[in-house]
Amino acid sequence: MESPQLPPSMKRPAIVYGDKTPTILETTLGHLLDELSDIHRDKAAVEFPWQSIRRTYSELAKTSKLVAISLLSAGLCHGDRIGILTGNRYEFLDVFLAAARIGCPAVILQSNMSPGEMKAAVLKSGTTGNPKAAVLTHRNVVNNSHFFSRACDFEQSDIICSPLPLCHSFGLVSAFLCSFMRGCLILFPTEKFSADAVVDVLQNRDVTVIYGVPTMFFAVLEKLQGRGHKPRSMVKAIAGGAPVPYALITQICQDMGVQYFLNGYGMTETSPATFISPLGLCSESSLRTIGKVLPHTNARIVDRWGRTVQQGEKGELCISGLPLQKGYWEDEEKTSEIMTRDADGVIWLHTGDEAIIGEDDHCTITGRIKDIIIRGGLNISPVEIEERLILHPFIQEASVVGLPDKTRGEIVGCFLKQYVDMQRPSDEAVRAWVRELLGWHKAPEAIFWIGDAGIGEDFPKTASGKHQKEKLKDIGTYLLA
């Protein structure tokens, strides 16, 4: 039963404080690597099946020491930046861990970065504009992986499949370091995401946990349906990186045989995880939110003037506490835009996400503030329209954007991907489907289908799998001109 609504006078400010336990770990990645090597020794830690490489905990520690010695012999000194430009390969981890040992910030590079952008420890993916370089400390990532892995309740017997790119904080910290922290084995199916490779691992290995962003799960589910049978040992699925529609969660639980679904939230600037849904059986009541804040993390919802709103009211989600980045590398202006100090001297990081904190202290993300569509003065959230669209039996994936309109400012546009071998619904049928639950003003006026002329064969995505909505807006604007 839903909790009763409090009168406005009885509602509390929308601010939550994470637990003060467990104790913050004051160690470095290098020391942690040696400690875990002593504990787990010959237990398998990581595997790259496509490279036929498997490393134990002791082998990871030994190899990273040898690489560290080689880097020092090459003339590198404490504080020098070491660039890593590769996909999900074992060499990535060797260099990353070696850099951590000798105090050299690892600069995680992507192939599409310009030289001027290659400047810091972890690069923010960014669905628009140039990625910014978020500077994270050992304290940040060690403790974030510690708290997140505890919330996921990993066991040493777990075998984890992660198709997430190591060049992003979700894949590097929330997947690899969390697995490492708990003594698990983690598999990286291939260098770059391949749904076929993921399904091969799920069906041929005793995988108990899978990570992914929504677009990855859509692709993997499609391949699983084509092969006709579920993974044989799946227990948990962990998603993040973008809002996860409840219809997708339901499909993951049903088609993958998942018992527990965990919905994480964060951003590179917060190390990255700040929220995670409670560990419970797949159910609508527990999975409509991103859960509660992690330990040593605080969150609040503010209005456009920076004032804390009341519980149940929408506003921008802000984060403070242990997970905050030091700032953007050599960019005080960008740092000051996103990180502000309140009257009490507390630094808050503005996420750019619209959210609600309920009376049970659970948080719900309602969309990116910059993605909100303003149609004739009405604010429309793309997320709720996307959730409705993918409930249609013939629509596999959807992305909703605002498109310019001379009279109303913006109209609702959507880009849709149909299931293979399914009949495409008419545009009017799509609008009627949305109007049925959400009202006439949220029905898309401009409808585009992936695969049609001028659209492309797939959604434009970042390296981490997020839809690039700015590119979709450009495509839609051009086609409507």
Curated annotation (Swiss-Prot):
ATP binds at residues 124-132, 263-268, 353, 368, 466. Its EC number is 6.2.1.-. The keyword Membrane does not apply. InterPro entries: AMP-bd_C (IPR025110), AMP-bd_C_sf (IPR045851), AMP-dep_synth/lig_dom (IPR000873), ANL_N_sf (IPR042099). The keyword Ribosomal protein does not apply. One of its GO terms (biological process) is fatty acid metabolic process. Keywords: ATP-binding, Ligase, Nucleotide-binding. Substrate binds at residue 268. A motif (PTS2-type peroxisomal targeting signal) lies at residues 3-11. Pfam families: AMP-binding, AMP-binding_C. It comes from the Eukaryota. One of its GO terms (molecular function) is ATP binding. Belongs to the ATP-dependent AMP-binding enzyme family. Acyl-CoA ligase; part of the gene cluster that mediates the biosynthesis of communesins, a prominent class of indole alkaloids with great potential as pharmaceuticals. Communesins are biosynthesized by the coupling of tryptamine and aurantioclavine, two building blocks derived from L-tryptophan. The L-tryptophan decarboxylase cnsB converts L-tryptophan to tryptamine, whereas the tryptophan dimethylallyltransferase cnsF converts L-tryptophan to 4-dimethylallyl tryptophan which is further transformed to aurantioclavine by the aurantioclavine synthase cnsA, probably aided by the catalase cnsD. PANTHER family: ACYL COA SYNTHETASE (EUROFUNG) (PTHR43201:SF6), ACYL-COA SYNTHETASE (PTHR43201). This is Acyl-CoA ligase cnsG. It comes from Penicillium expansum.
